[in-house]
Amino acid sequence: MIQQITSRVTTYKAHEEVVPEGSTQSHSSLVLKGFAARHQHLAGGKRQITAFHVPGDFMDLHSFLLKKMEDGVGALTPCTVAAVPHSDLREITKNYPYLTRVLWLTTLIDAAVHRTWIMTLGRMDARNRVAHFLCEMHDRLEAVGLTKDHGYDLRITQEELGDAFGLTTVHVNRILQELRGDGLITSRGKSVVINDWERLQKEGQYNPDYLHLSQQIERD
């Protein structure tokens, strides 16, 4: 159904703005290919990344009901994005209870990820935080068929990781070197392989329950 109501598909270049901060949207954007990030900027220009988006993610489903976007979305890599008009989402919520619950679940999982990120930012040290994130990205990418043998392409720079975790690029680089040196991961370019899943999970105190990957929605 969602595929049928997409009004247009747009390809964005890496670092191109997809949804401007403070904008009013008439559609919600669904990632078909590539990586994107949700972010907010401070007056001095500093950026806080509040979410990373992978294929299959709605990046701004909340714009369906919120009149103004307090955050923005930018492409981290070349991205293919489908626009789903809010007028069509309105029709879905009126006439298709099952799909309405699917959309609602999407926003609930998005909120669960945000709550977990708040916990990691507030209560974990930097190494635990990065380990937790590497586990999360593995499971999210595995769910859409983009992993192989505990390996995946992480198309996110160390600067972008720093903007998500409140760390300098130097600190992110040092943590990744430590994880490699301890045999937990292997990384080359944008490729990440998790060599010891159990140890990395323990390092990041990672429990995937908040992703609700096996959540089922009952049909009417």
Task: Label each PLM-derived region with a short phrase.
Residues R140-D220:
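Phosphate-/nucleic-acid-contacting segments
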Residues M1-A14, K68:
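Short proline/glycine- and basic residue-enriched helix-capping loop/turn segments at helix->loop/beta transitions
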